Amino acid sequence: MDEQVTLPPVADLTEAGPLKDRFLQAISSGTSLTVDASAVQRVSSPCLQVLVAGKQSFAKAGGASLTITDPSEAFRETASVLGLLDALELGK
């Protein structure tokens, strides 16, 4: 089972809490998630931290995965500045 989550144009602190809750729900039900980051124009470090923690939590739980697809240039640039490209499995 795979579901998609679409990040809004402004993925900031207000998005971090609900995103974390969605990840926890998916992990507990064994549901894989795909996070579409194509619309992101601005992303905050708290939101990126939740994504990194989510990647780690899904990996530890096994059975389900978290994939980030189509990161916008703004998303990729912020992740790069913060040194999170590898943690988010986005390469360079």
Mark where each language-model region is.
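STAS-like cytosolic regulatory interaction modules
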Residues: M1-P46, V52-K92
